[in-house]
């Protein structure tokens, strides 16, 4: 039988609502790391949050893909019906927006030479796989990647290991296997909401020692994922709208006294 204070605490935490993204450039400084705010709300305008490029002074780089808008170090190639990542992208580009196109895969040389690329947005494409080699010498050092509203059935295993934020919400991912997250030990935020995830293999989350936010809402999980107590920096967990029928006393916090970990800011368990 659980103590009443513990049940009350979990009930209060379970009412936490998802974060609301105000703008794509809403950086939050967290121990010196710029983090982009999340957008997990369904039905949101997929173009909201992208900078108003008309308000930015243009640069006169000769390298700008046909049909794209290039301002400063931002390249916006959205809504062009592109079937592949365009060529002739300036090597000093830091943000590349490719949302609302028909790109079906990421190939090994798509981003070759883009050593300063910080953020890549691939929302609402037809991406079902990535054929990048994990050790591809393309110099890509992404911090932020969003492949939402696509056709992924699993977590790609060949994305840059430099990622701090990976958002794969609104796909068709069904499971998280042990080796899926092996490369991504630097992740601070992982978004996997609105998928079809039924199973998370034990030990999968152990490869994410710096994780602070985990979004697993709107999936088909029947229990709280194993390994959450071991993530000492984890502060936010979204598990609402799943099929979770019970919560164990040790599902979120480590066993024993004197075990140091960050305090939770939010745990959402409603609609289970």
From Swiss-Prot:
Where it mainly occurs, coarsely classed, is: secreted
Pinpoint the residue ranges of every LRR repeat in the record. Answer: 92-113, 116-137, 138-161, 162-183, 186-209, 210-232, 233-254, 255-272
Cellular component, GO, one term: extracellular space
Q: Which residues does the record annotate as propeptide?
A: 17-37
**InterPro entries named among the record's database cross-references:** Leu-rich_rpt (IPR001611), Leu-rich_rpt_typical-subtyp (IPR003591), LRR_dom_sf (IPR032675), LRRNT (IPR000372), SLRP (IPR050333)
PANTHER family per the UniProt record, alphabetical? AGAP008170-PA (PTHR45712), BIGLYCAN (PTHR45712:SF11)
Instruction: Specify the protein name.
Output: Biglycan
Give the species.
Sus scrofa (Pig)
